[in-house]
């Protein structure tokens, strides 16, 4: 792909140069001007995801803000592929999505792609992905979305999505899909069709769709933008996040398939302490003496990166910690202890909300205001084929 890293919808390798990725994908930087406009329209302080440039790139976010300002509105769409338990890296974009829903007061559609994960993961049965769909939905509900403005749907249940995907699939030839996703003669035919299903929710409303997601998912929306207007809809907009690194390295991203690299949302306090102490990469010097004399290197430290991305809300405290590390005033052990306490505190509250979500799942999927509308809604005319 680009230089020494690789980014596709299915794998991320190497230390990602996000500026080069913007150039390669043809997206635009999420500028200070756009962030200031967001704060102005929402009359709110920006969350750390925006302040610290965790979301760094976009497609047509400027048009989303213009639509909102001029009264046309927009809607949100994101999703989750249920192949296993969710970890910290999975849930962070959902918190950004929650902020957008809350501040702009818009509808949100969350697609659970149990079909995709069955097709793409040789080791998973369809029953496996349905099981993980339920477990993952509990974690998503625990984020705190508005149950009357949020529709969570599984592709295997909400079969109306298939009817919508048919005319979309007719717009995409194999050479287009191959160029974007790198399909080969060994690719399953279900994999080749699946992009049409993932694109379908961008047409749930006759407004512009905004997708908050990690940038590795951008290829799906590039395809949508090629033909959306021919169906009488808007090209979808997107804001792209960076990747949350694993505990063990700043390269690639956290992976559920490597338990030692991830903190799962169901981990116990003991699990958290053990993993951070044993596996978390730091920017410390080989000896305490060198650490005191030369200072640490927070730029190379996963512990600091996790605090920056999610676990230290206070900008002043984060800055103080950065310079205390650089000046040799902090040891790696002190930083690890601090991160452990932050993660444990977050998971304690998340797991309480997750338990309550068991009684809310019906509302998000079937009985909430937006959910009922979607189950009753007819297929839009342009998507009837």
From Swiss-Prot:
GO MF terms, alphabetically ordered: ATP binding; tryptophan-tRNA ligase activity
Record carries keyword Protein transport: no
The reaction(s) this protein catalyses: tRNA(Trp) + L-tryptophan + ATP = L-tryptophyl-tRNA(Trp) + AMP + diphosphate + H(+)
EC number: 6.1.1.2
Motif window: 'HIGH' region: 82-90
Keywords, comma-separated and alphabetical: Aminoacyl-tRNA synthetase, ATP-binding, Cytoplasm, Ligase, Nucleotide-binding, Protein biosynthesis
Short sequence motif 'KMSKS' region: positions: 253-257
Major location category of this protein: cytoplasm
Record-level GO cellular component terms: cytoplasm
GO BP term, example: tryptophanyl-tRNA aminoacylation
Family in the record: Belongs to the class-I aminoacyl-tRNA synthetase family.
UniProt-listed HAMAP family: Trp_tRNA_synth_A
Listed NCBIfam families: PRK12285.1-1, PRK12285.1-4, trpS
Protein known as: Tryptophan--tRNA ligase
Annotated organism of origin: Pyrococcus abyssi (strain GE5 / Orsay)
Organism ancestry: Archaea, Methanobacteriati, Methanobacteriota, Thermococci, Thermococcales
Gene (name only): trpS
């Amino acid at each position: 792909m680009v230089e020494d890293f690789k980014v596709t919808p299915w794998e991320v390798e190497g230390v990602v140069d996000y500026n080069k990725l913007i150039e390669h994908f043809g997206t635009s930087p999420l500028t200070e001007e756009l962030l200031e406009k967001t704060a102005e329209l929402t009359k709110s302080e920006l969350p750390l995801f925006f302040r610290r440039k965790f979301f760094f790139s976009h497609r047509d976010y400027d048009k989303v803000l213009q639509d909102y300002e001029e009264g046309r509105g927009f809607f949100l769409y994101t999703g989750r592929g249920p192949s296993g338990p969710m970890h910290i890296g999975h849930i962070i974009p959902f918190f950004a999505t929650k902020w957008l829903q809350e501040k702009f007061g818009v509808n949100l559609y969350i697609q659970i792609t149990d079909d995709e994960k069955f097709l793409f993961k040789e080791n998973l049965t369809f029953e496996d992905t349905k099981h993980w769909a339920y477990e993952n939905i509990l974690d998503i509900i625990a984020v705190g979305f508005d149950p009357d403005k949020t529709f969570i749907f599984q592709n295997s249940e909400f079969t109306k999505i298939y009817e919508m995907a048919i005319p979309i699939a007719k717009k995409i030839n194999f050479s287009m899909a191959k160029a974007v996703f790198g399909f080969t003669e060994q690719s399953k035919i279900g994999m080749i069709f699946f992009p049409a299903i993932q694109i379908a929710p961008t047409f749930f409303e006759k407004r512009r769709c905004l997708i908050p997601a990690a940038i590795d998912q951008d290829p799906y929306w590039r395809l949508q933008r090629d033909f959306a207007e021919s169906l009488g809809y808007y090209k979808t907009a997107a804001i792209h996040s960076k990747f949350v690194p694993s505990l063990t390295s700043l390269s690639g991203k956290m992976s559920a398939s490597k338990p030692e690299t991830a903190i799962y949302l169901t981990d116990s306090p003991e699990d958290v302490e053990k993993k951070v102490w044993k596996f978390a990469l730091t920017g410390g010097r080989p000896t305490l003496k060198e650490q005191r004399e030369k200072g640490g290197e927070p730029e190379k430290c996963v512990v600091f990166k996790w605090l920056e991305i999610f676990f230290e809300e206070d900008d002043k405290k984060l800055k103080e910690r950065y310079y205390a590390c650089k000046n040799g005033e902090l040891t790696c052990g002190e930083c690890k202890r601090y991160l452990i306490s932050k993660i444990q505190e977050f998971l304690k509250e998340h797991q309480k909300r997750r338990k309550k979500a068991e009684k809310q799942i019906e509302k998000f999927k079937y009985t909430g205001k937006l959910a009922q509308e979607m189950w009753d809604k007819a297929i839009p005319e342009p998507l009837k084929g």
